[in-house]
A protein has these predicted regions:
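Residue-level detector of functionally pivotal "anchor" positions at catalytic/ligand-binding pockets or at interdomain
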Residues: 474-500
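CBM-like carbohydrate-recognition segments
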Residues: 22-79, 83-162, 221, 327, ...
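Active-site cradle of extracellular carbohydrate-active enzymes
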Residues: 209, 216, 224-233, 262-339
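Boundary at the C-terminal end of the N-terminal hydrophobic targeting segment
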Residues: 16-20
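Sec-dependent N-terminal signal peptides
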Residues: 4-13
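C-terminal tail/sorting-segment detector
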Residues: 512-523
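Extended ligand-binding groove/face enriched in aromatic
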Residues: 100-255, 272-273, 277
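Well-ordered alpha-helical scaffold segments within catalytic/enzyme domains
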Residues: 23, 74-99, 166-181, 228-264, ...
């Protein structure tokens, strides 16, 4: 006898729903793999030791442009992490997919992270409270040699804090997937680097001005240089608590008299405190209470200011203007994801209120109804042409935050509605506009006259499909019910392709099989 999960189609509604979710999860994951593989083929060049992503490719030819910046390259790492997480989550439902792809993507992930070294540079940064040499900082453009990234070019503007934040997030995910402590250690270094960009000068009330500038060469403080680090900070808190809860860190800051001082802090608590502090700062300064979405930035004068001389020279505070700029989906998405993590760790119900608020107003504020083929779709922001704008990835950041929020206790119904609309739009584009296994940025409108695309857009779509697979898998787990099925030699068993399977109760493959008109899930 073999234990299985047995679904009597059209007979047991709860189990039928579970199989529906499982089928959708596998379909989403399969499409993620298809798009990611096509993107790696068309948008990447070079050898394993000198591997790079091109900026633009063409679905109708082999034409490509030069190397991409570190931001799109990081999105390719993200896509691999998302697919690997989905493969692990669906290992029992889709063992063939797991066996075929898991080791391949682990190997490819290692290659991608190793070749980050072409963006890496080092320099001595004079910040608000410290003067320190950082050996692992990633430049915007790719260098021709490892470790020669131009992190000081254009008056420090060729490295920005948000790039380090996105990388820290994906390196933590890579560490969780592989156990490679090098990834964890780099993520910690990058996190400490961006925290060093926190404006710790105090105002006339003794309060920190707070906020992290866009980069060490900027005075403006952006949603994208604050919100993205909240989730990684909470993750690092979890990791340090689990691995070395007594780990200490020397933190430099400015005291009530604006003098530089330091204190020894527990590293795990330090990360959680900063996650809460950055979240509170961004909500106070960039939240639009009218739209319930987040502004882009606080502007400021371009000229950096310093105090002191020689070894005592430090960066000075520069006043910022009021909130301004377009409300982009990703800037609200990072706050939604941050609220989910902070609710999980702190239990503070104020974060739950924020989750519900953002889940609702992202749906009503960023998506709009579109009639197409007699049906109503919800269209999320897109760009006029594939070579202008980044809305495909911005939407991806918001969508993955909805996946996070959907797993929180008593999730908002807007989470499911939003995720359903993302999935529906991707499927529409896949069914109507797929070219060379790639999708147009206008999922509902198609390619038009364009055949060019960016790998950045395509890895975003792959990430979305992979995270949707995880969302569907969770829904299946909530719906599945278990019964026992007795193996009989006289029964014919088939895989989902209709191919007959040979074997005994002990040798039938794990995963979804079909027997006597019933779908079986073999554990």
């Amino acid at each position: 006898m073999i234990k299985v999960i047995l679904t009597l189609l059209l007979a047991v509604a709860r189990s039928a729903a579970a199989w529906s979710q499982s089928s959708k999860a596998i379909n989403d994951l399969s499409k993620a793999i298809e798009i990611l593989d096509a993107t790696m083929e068309r948008s990447f060049r070079g050898s394993n030791t000198n591997y790079y992503m091109v900026d633009v490719c063409d679905v109708a030819s082999d034409a490509v442009s030069g190397p991409s910046d570190v931001w799109p390259y990081t999105a390719a790492i993200e896509a691999h992490c998302s697919v690997l997480e989905a493969l692990s989550a669906l290992k029992e439902e889709a063992p063939d997919l797991y066996d075929l792809h898991h080791e391949h993507y682990l190997h490819q992930l290692d290659i991608l992270i190793d070749n980050l070294d072409y963006y890496r540079g080092s320099y001595t940064l004079v910040s608000y409270a410290t003067r320190k040499t950082w050996n692992t900082v990633y430049a915007v453009p790719r260098a021709n040699q490892r470790g020669r990234g131009d992190v000081t070019g254009d008056n420090l503007k060729k490295n920005v804090y948000d790039d380090q934040m996105w990388l820290a997030r994906e390196l933590i995910r890579a560490y969780r997937l592989t156990g490679n402590t090098t990834y964890r250690d780099i993520a910690i270094d990058l996190t400490n680097y961006v925290i060093d960009g926190w404006d710790c000068w105090r105002d006339s009330n003794g309060e920190e001005y707070g906020g992290i500038t866009w980069g060490p060469g900027y005075n403006s403080k952006h949603a994208c240089s604050n919100g993205p680090i909240i989730q990684p900070l909470v993750w690092l808190h979890d990791i340090v608590m689990a691995e070395d809860s007594d780990a200490m860190y020397t933190y430099f800051y400015r005291d009530d008299d604006n003098q530089v001082t330091s204190k020894a802090v527990k590293l795990a608590e330090h990360y959680l405190d900063f996650a809460k502090k950055i979240y509170a700062w961004q909500k106070k300064h960039l939240y639009n209470s009218q739209t319930h979405l987040y502004y882009d930035m606080l502007g400021a004068d371009y000229a950096l200011q310093y105090v002191g001389t020689g070894a005592a020279r430090r960066r000075a505070h520069v006043d910022n203007g009021g909130p301004t700029g377009t409300a982009y989906p990703y800037n609200t998405g990072t706050m939604l994801a941050g609220a989910v993590e902070l609710l999980r760790v702190t239990g503070d119900e104020r974060y739950r209120d924020d989750i519900d608020d953002l889940a609702r107003y992202c749906y009503t504020g960023f998506s709009r109804p579109v009639r197409l083929d007699g049906m109503t779709y919800r269209q999320w922001p897109t760009d006029a042409t594939p070579l202008q704008g980044f809305n495909a990835w911005f939407d991806n950041v918001l969508m993955r935050a909805y996946v996070d929020a959907s797993a929180s206790p008593a999730p908002s119904p807007y989470c499911g509605q939003s995720l359903q609309s993302f999935e529906t739009n991707l499927n529409y584009a896949y069914d109507h506009y797929l070219k060379s296994h790639m999708l147009p940025i206008d999922l509902l409108g198609g390619w038009g006259d364009n055949t060019k695309t960016k790998g950045f857009h395509q890895v975003s779509f792959a990430s979305e499909y992979a995270m949707l697979a995880i969302w569907r898998h969770r829904q299946q787990a909530d719906a599945v019910s278990e019964v026992r099925h007795e193996y009989r030699p006289s029964t014919h068993y088939y895989n989902l392709l209709g191919q007959p399977l040979q074997g005994t109760a002990g040798t039938l493959p794990h995963g979804i099989l079909v027997a006597s008109g019933h779908k079986l899930f073999v554990k």
